[in-house]
Amino acid sequence: MTFTLPQLPYALDALAPHVSKETLEYHYGKHHNTYVTNLNKLIPGTEFESMTLEEIIMKAKGGIFNNAAQVWNHTFYWHSMSPNGGGEPKGRLAEAINKSFGSFAAFKEQFSQTAATTFGSGWAWLVQDQSGALKIINTSNAGTPMTEGLNALLTCDVWEHAYYIDYRNRRPDYIEAFWSLVNWDFASSNLK
């Protein structure tokens, strides 16, 4: 199976001023695309060549896992944001956040703290566990909740390439800007 770079759900300049067109040109057009290209170079002639992306992630190790997971993580991240995003969730997701964290404000503070304090490169995630409870986790490098049996609802990429053009070393400023873009409809659609 040959993988292709998924289309962004918005134009390259649609997230500005929070995330610039230049950042998306590099992050999506170069970084994400490189993971797709590398995965396509690594899987021919292996047991993974006819598997779906999710099957590869669940079974692979090393370079194949890293590139497959980064393709999936980035695609999920692009959908976690919207030019019409921000605000607060509604309906079932709002209720689940209040039940798990006490309030939206408490959730936002905990998620921001997790994202800001993730050491090195990684991801901050809002996930749903097997019991239906919501949790905030971080994964390092190419880690993904899928391999931990968790259902991803929302993610914030905290690899430096996600924010360095716009925010330099000010990760907390990038995280604050992320809240203006959060696609709550997408997060809600992932709720089981």
Swiss-Prot record:
It is an enzyme of class 1 (oxidoreductase). Keywords: Iron, Metal-binding, Oxidoreductase. The keyword Manganese does not apply. Disulfide bonds: none annotated. This is Superoxide dismutase [Fe]. Pfam families: Sod_Fe_C, Sod_Fe_N. The keyword Cell wall biogenesis/degradation does not apply. It catalyses: 2 superoxide + 2 H(+) = H2O2 + O2. Homodimer. Its cofactor is Fe cation. GO terms for molecular function: metal ion binding; superoxide dismutase activity. Destroys superoxide anion radicals which are normally produced within the cells and which are toxic to biological systems. Fe cation binds at H27, H74, D157, H161. Binds 1 Fe cation per subunit. Its EC number is 1.15.1.1. Belongs to the iron/manganese superoxide dismutase family.
